[in-house]
Amino acid sequence: MRDTQSTASSLSVSIGQATSAGHKAHNQDFHGALVPDERALSFKGITIALADGISTSDVSAVASETIVKSLLSDYYSTPDAWTVKTSASRVISAANSWLYAQSRFAGLADADHGHVCTLATMVLKARTAHLFHVGDSRIWRLSGLSLEPLTTDHHVSLGSGDTVLTRAIGAASSVDIEYRAEPVSRGNVFLLTTDGVHEHWTARTVAQRIAEASTLDDAAQDILKDALEAGSTDNLTVQIVRIDSVPTSDETQFDEQARTLPIPALPREGSVLDGYRILRELHANHRSHIFLAKASDGETVAVKIPASDLKDDADGLRRFLMEDWIARRLDNAHVLGAPASLGPRSGLYVVTDFIEGQTLRQWMQDNPKPSFEQVRDILEQVIRGLRAFHRREMLHQDLRPENIMLDTDGVVKIIDFGSTYVAGVQEAAPMREEDGILGTLQYTAPEYFSGEQVSWRSDLFSLGVIAYEMLTGVLPYGTQVGKVRNPRDRRRLRYRNARDDAHPMPAWLDDALAKAVHPDPARRHDALSEFAANLRSPSLRYTARRHIPLAERNPERFWKTLSGGLALLCLVLATLAFQ
């Protein structure tokens, strides 16, 4: 083999690999590496993997080949919005389940004779090495003359000196994957090895081979020869990865577009922008101008042009361009989509589908006292749209009535992705912390203000506030959420009951709203579907709580009520005594 080197200027590596059956008749190890094109390099990274089939099985070589090939192909088919951890873990788990099923189908119930192997994988993305490990193959970092193991062996030693794997690919229907993330810098050297190699080497010899060899492939071959001469009787595989360069900035393809393309001058009615004939302006604010346009293929679309004030705001322009990227990756009836591109663009703008209808804000003004069923129907459609975001590891982060549209057929769609968090993009190029709160204060979850961990439950909070406002016309905490600065402030928030004389509703419905907007994210619903269900019928928690005595359900209220009753009784008795 020869060195494999990436061609992208941002992340560049050299890879050397070697494998050998050793003194055995068959090689049950398998290995591979993939340096993708520049687009995939940015969003997915470089993958290096090896696997070692167990020696007691005649089909373990199939397992080794399957898991490595799955990673080198299926990993790059996962959504760009996913993190490396999510993408690789899903692929590994799927391959594990398939291999386990193959063994069961073939009647190989004993794991010692099934499609079973170890796995060591490294994915390099931006300035981080993501390590995935199952079994007793290893990943190392070479520092000078020292070898630092970055993985833990998943095996136990027997009295005879043999070992038994406690974790392996294909041994069970599910697999526990060891994961670790390590920062990388130029000059770092990593090694992936099977036990036939690392049980028969020394750090000094490894460092010497890598330093003296003309190529990393030659170094890998020399390391195998040394292990064989040292008495290895197993299959042997080693991969050497040298980091030649890492990204010097957090620039993404969005930043490159923002740097190279100009913001177009605001078009006049009837003018044409790259094949889009402008019909009229639909909306304008400090961030953008939106125009109704007719594409050259006859489709009616919306053209969104950033405001000139954004020209020096790199992060603002990145978020603007990400709106188009997000719209093209969320194929959902309840999320704003984007039409096929007409070709290269001469400037910075995005094109989305045109929604003929009204915002939820306008609908709420037109329907100040909606029926419960109307509210449920709208919220359930929003939930279906939100699921599309969360399945792609995205958070909308600015869910509010102005960012929800109802078309003329009553179909609800989530719009405006300028504040959306995309885990996979954030992993490659983090946004600056000083950007602050991106959403609208009244609808933003308190954990954003207190500096605590945000999650999909943060979007649930926003949805709960919208539901509360649709039913009452006011907000559950007024303006208090925007004043939160720390966890103590968050805990002081007090929910205002939605149920009163002006807004009659079942107590269980008020309970569902209170749970959705609870100040503590952990005490909100466990799934969006749970919130949807609780909008239609009482939750089991609510029903059970109704049957708990007041003294247990709310001791403070019980004793206050009892004390008040006793005080009233004493007053009555005293009055009677003096008559």
Please provide the spans of the model-predicted regions.
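PP2C/PPM-type serine/threonine phosphatase catalytic domain
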Residues: M1-A302, P306-M322, R329-D331, G343-Y349, ...
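Conserved HxN/HPN-centered segment at the entrance to the catalytic loop
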Residues: D331-P339
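AlphaC helix of the protein kinase catalytic domain
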Residues: L360-P370
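C-terminal lobe helix-coil module of Hanks-type protein kinase domains
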Residues: Q442-Y542
